[in-house]
């Protein structure tokens, strides 16, 4: 990647930052104002976006996120461990990398298993992966959709499974 393009990416991309609303949804809905605990990242060569909560313990918050390094301009899916007191990232593991850009690692929990279906619009399809907790990686299960779609959300509505997505 050329220097001007890298510089542009760094300037534009550096504005992404993860945060947690302190007052929860009730505080936001009651008065419309909220304060944020911003996640402190030790990484200056990348940013994180599209957070989905994998787990919360007494000490830590575990997120699946899009990780984007300036040096390699494509997203990867990472698992972040965040300290609940300091809101500092204390661990980072890449759990899925493809040849194309990945983002929006939406989580689906079914029958005691955790599935993830990250956006892969550049790859032209939406794949389903099972989260292998022991090895901290995503294992391919099947292709959900052979089309270019963005930010998909699978849910149950009116007694039926539904998928909401964006298409260009």
Regions found by a protein language model. Give the residues of each.
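Beta-rich carbohydrate-recognition and catalytic domains
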Residues: 1-49, 54-102, 108-168
């Amino acid at each position: 990647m050329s220097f001007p393009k890298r510089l542009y990416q760094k300037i534009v991309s550096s504005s992404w930052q993860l945060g947690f609303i302190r007052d929860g949804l009730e505080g936001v809905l009651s008065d419309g104002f909220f304060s944020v605990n911003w996640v402190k990242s030790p990484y200056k060569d990348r940013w994180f976006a599209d957070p989905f909560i994998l787990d919360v313990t007494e000490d830590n918050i575990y997120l699946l996120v899009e990780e984007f390094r300036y040096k390699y301009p494509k997203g990867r899916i990472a698992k972040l461990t965040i300290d609940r007191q300091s809101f500092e990232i204390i661990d980072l593991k890449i759990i899925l990398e493809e040849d194309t850009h990945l983002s929006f690692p939406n989580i689906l929990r079914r029958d005691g298993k955790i599935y993830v279906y990250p956006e892969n619009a550049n790859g032209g399809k939406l794949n389903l992966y099972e989260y292998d907790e022991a090895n901290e990686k995503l294992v391919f299960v099947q292709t959900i959709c052979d089309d270019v779609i963005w930010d998909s959300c699978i849910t149950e509505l009116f007694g039926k499974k539904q998928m909401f997505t964006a298409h260009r």
